[in-house]
Amino acid sequence: MAAKIIDGKTIAQQVRSEVAQKVQARVAAGLRAPGLAVVLVGSNPASQIYVASKRKACDEVGFVSRSYDLPETTSEAELLALIDTLNADNTIDGILVQLPLPAGIDNVKVLERIAPDKDVDGFHPYNVGRLCQRAPRLRPCTPRGIVTLLERYNIDTYGLNAVVIGASNIVGRPMSMELLLAGCTTTVTHRFTKDLRHHVEHADLLIVAVGKPGFIPGEWIKEGAIVIDVGINRLENGKIVGDVVFDEAAARASYITPVPGGVGPMTVATLIENTLQACIEYHDPQGK
């Protein structure tokens, strides 16, 4: 069996085009364009690349994009004060603080300072709690982007045995909640899991997010499984690979996401969707 490739770049482009059309309709009706504030502290090269892609996507769909590039020496108090200012700004619908933050700044305190109705990353306890209670509003971007991929490929998830490898707050934990909403019987594995291979071999839907190249051998993949690889790892030779041994897995799976070009583009596309949603549902309801 040769797996069908789940093309995240194409689906992400479709999502952005749909958002752009809605923004154009808003502006044509005399309503304001959604606004996104992107905050970067320090000069982490990977963070700079991620932030640039988010700002580019904002421009592409017609959002108002505000950039705040703060020095590495920025204090926690200064960052919190900026967030307070953005929370009170009626032209800003979403606030994104790029992680990781420099040492000395408490990630949790910063993320919890963002108003829940402007938390377009979906990390605030309010938004995670709503997802857990089956009443989601602004949803964590990567898990929601994965669900969008499955939906766009008309993959029926109801009744599937889903296994999530990795239990991070950003992907693994909210992903498990999304999969429950999608009708899956869901298992989350982590560093204390015994016999990881057993869990992988029984997964109809496998989602891997650990950040270790080639962590899951292809021979573990169940015949016909759907494989979603969230990992983005740069090898010493410069090649970008995922957490799953792609060629081996693709020979056994029915669907698989490539790295790059699979999940990554969907994270940014979902951020854009969330910003439009925040604008319409929370801040500018006449634009519905």
From Swiss-Prot:
Belongs to the tetrahydrofolate dehydrogenase/cyclohydrolase family. Keywords: Amino-acid biosynthesis, Histidine biosynthesis, Hydrolase, Methionine biosynthesis, Multifunctional enzyme, NADP, One-carbon metabolism, Oxidoreductase, Purine biosynthesis. HAMAP family: THF_DHG_CYH (MF_01576). GO terms for cellular component: cytosol. It comes from Salmonella enteritidis PT4 (strain P125109). This is Bifunctional protein FolD. Gene3D superfamilies: Leucine Dehydrogenase, chain A, domain 1, NAD(P)-binding Rossmann-like Domain. The gene is folD. Homodimer.
